[in-house]
């Protein structure tokens, strides 16, 4: 048993020793392989490091070469720029040298001129001294010979010169006044003609009677009433004469006051429509008619101010303005006349650069006094000035009202324009009844003269008789004949008619060729 154990121990020891040596040899073999591998790795690392070192050296050399090249190029550029600057500085220096030389020459020349001027000044002063001495000697000699002092001689010469010049100045002033007057006349005519052509105003002939139509003649008896009480009541309340004659189905109202006449017409119309006609009903209808007329007057005033473009009038003044519709002057409606004057004055003011709206306002109100001149003492000019002052109108408007008939001196251009527009509107052919017949006769005579020639188809007198247009037959009158016809008609007008201004004769020859495509 013991031997077995010993044998086992010996085997174990021997196995351990053998295992130790085996492991040692294996470890040494591994260590040797590792060393060889490490040496190989070290060698490869050395080779890689050498390659990197060479590559880095090459890159460094390339960078150094590149930097050197750039530096050399930069140095060359700087040298070139410095050379250019040096050249420019040298050029400037040369220019400065030349300028300095020129300035030196100029300074020398100026010094020479100054010296010459000083010498000339001294010479002039010497000459002036000699001249003064000679003048004094001559004055003394002249005073001795003429027996006049210097002041007396001056006065004598000035008087002679003044006499000679005064005549020349007077002639020049007269010529200037003549030219100015001619130019002013031309300008005034141009402005007036333009204003007249641009102003288109309608006109209605006014009469002193109104006619009320009746449904039948039996109504006349009802209007007269028992023992004439109805007609007397109506005449008493309105102040209008009722004329009931043989005129069928009509009653004539006659009166000088258009407002009363209009009141009577409205009242009578209402009575006829109502059918109940007796004094109490008449009084009621007359009251209604008066209120309607008052309202109509106010509306007319407002419409007129709107039409003319005048704003800001006092309400009472607007109502007074509306009353002008029922006033006439030589048959011309005063409200229409005032509107026409307003537009004419405004047009002329615009041409002259004046306030057009203020001129319209003054023209519209210039005859405002005529609305109540039959109710208040004084002329329509005085009443108009009082009204305009009362309602605080513009001073130019007040002066225009006061001066439009020459009673007061105009203080503004607008006042003069209003007076001119008033004269134009009143004198316009056809505006007032006293000139209407002559005006129509002259227009008819113009057309009669034109149509008396063979080949004339139709003639028209237009522009208030300032032009006649003749339409001729083209198959009878050629172009040359048209000129001859115009001259012949012009001669006959000059020989046979009396007219203001001039008349334009226009011959119109028209040929038409018409075809129809089917």
Swiss-Prot record:
Entry keyword set: Cell membrane, Endonuclease, Hydrolase, Membrane, Nuclease, RNA-binding, Transmembrane, Transmembrane helix
NCBIfam families in alphabetical order: HDIG (TIGR00277), RNase_Y (TIGR03319)
EC class (word): hydrolase
Keyword Transport included in the entry's annotation: no
Disulfide bonds: none
Residue stretches making up the KH domain: 208-271
Domain HD: start-end pairs: 334-427
Classification via InterPro entries: HD/PDEase_dom (IPR003607), HD_domain (IPR006674), HDIG_dom (IPR006675), KH_dom (IPR004087), KH_dom_type_1 (IPR004088), KH_dom_type_1_sf (IPR036612), Ribonuclease_Y (IPR017705), RNase_Y_N (IPR022711)
Task of the protein: Endoribonuclease that initiates mRNA decay.
Name listed for the protein in its UniProt record: Ribonuclease Y
A Pfam family matched in the record: HD
Major location category of this protein: membrane
Transmembrane segments: 2-22
Record HAMAP family: RNase_Y
Gene Ontology MF term list: RNA binding; RNA endonuclease activity
Membrane-related topology note: Single-pass membrane protein
Cellular location(s): Cell membrane
PANTHER family: RIBONUCLEASE Y (PTHR12826:SF15)
Single Gene Ontology BP annotation: mRNA catabolic process
Family: Belongs to the RNase Y family.
């Amino acid at each position: 048993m013991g031997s077995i154990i010993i044998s086992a121990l010996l085997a174990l020891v021997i196995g351990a020793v053998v295992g130790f040596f085996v492991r040692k040899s294996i470890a040494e073999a591994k260590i040797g392989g590792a060393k060889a591998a490490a040496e190989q790795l070290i060698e490869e690392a050395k080779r890689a490091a050498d390659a990197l070192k060479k590559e880095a050296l090459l890159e460094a050399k390339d960078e150094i070469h590149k930097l050197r090249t750039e530096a050399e190029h930069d140095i060359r550029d700087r040298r070139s720029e410095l050379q250019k600057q040096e050249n420019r500085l040298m050029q400037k220096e040369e220019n400065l040298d030349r300028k300095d030389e020129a300035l030196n020459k100029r300074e020398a020349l100026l010094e020479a001129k100054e010296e010459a001027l000083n010498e000339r000044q001294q010479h002039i002063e010497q000459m002036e001294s000699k001249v003064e001495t000679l003048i004094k000697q001559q004055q003394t000699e002249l005073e001795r010979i003429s027996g006049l002092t210097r002041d007396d001689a001056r006065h004598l010469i000035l008087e002679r010169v003044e006499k000679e010049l005064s005549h020349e100045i007077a002639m020049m002033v007269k010529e200037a006044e003549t030219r100015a007057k001619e130019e002013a006349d031309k300008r005034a005519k141009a402005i007036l003609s333009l204003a007249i052509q641009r102003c288109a105003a309608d006109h209605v002939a006014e009469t002193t009677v109104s006619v009320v139509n009746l449904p039948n003649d039996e109504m006349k008896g009802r209007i007269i009433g028992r023992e004439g009480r109805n007609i007397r009541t109506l005449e008493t309340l309105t102040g209008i004469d009722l004329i009931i004659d043989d005129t069928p189905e009509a009653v004539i109202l006659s009166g000088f006051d258009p407002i009363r006449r209009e009141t009577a017409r409205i009242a009578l119309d209402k009575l006829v429509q109502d059918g109940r006609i007796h004094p109490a009903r008449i009084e009621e209808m007359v009251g209604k008619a008066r209120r309607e007329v008052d309202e109509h007057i106010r509306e007319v005033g407002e419409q007129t101010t709107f039409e003319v473009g005048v704003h800001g009038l006092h309400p009472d003044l607007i109502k007074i303005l509306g009353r002008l519709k029922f006033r006439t002057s030589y048959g011309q409606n005063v409200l229409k006349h005032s509107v026409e004057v307003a537009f004419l004055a405004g047009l002329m003011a615009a041409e002259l650069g004046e306030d057009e709206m203020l001129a319209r306002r003054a023209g519209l109100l210039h005859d405002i006094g005529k609305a109540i001149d039959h109710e208040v003492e004084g002329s329509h000019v005085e009443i108009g000035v009082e009204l305009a002052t009362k309602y605080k109108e513009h001073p130019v408007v007040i002066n225009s009202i006061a001066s439009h008939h020459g009673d007061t001196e105009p203080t503004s251009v607008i006042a003069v324009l209003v007076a001119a527009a008033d004269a134009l509107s009143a004198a316009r052919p056809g505006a007032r009844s006293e000139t209407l017949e002559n005006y129509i006769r002259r227009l008819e005579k113009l057309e009669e003269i034109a149509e008396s020639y063979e080949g004339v188809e139709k003639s028209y007198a237009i522009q208030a008789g300032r032009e006649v247009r003749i339409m001729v037959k083209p198959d009878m009158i050629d172009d040359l004949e048209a000129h001859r016809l115009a001259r012949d008609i012009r001669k006959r007008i000059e020989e046979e008619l009396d007219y203001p201004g001039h008349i334009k004769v226009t011959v119109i020859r028209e040929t038409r060729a018409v075809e129809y495509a089917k």
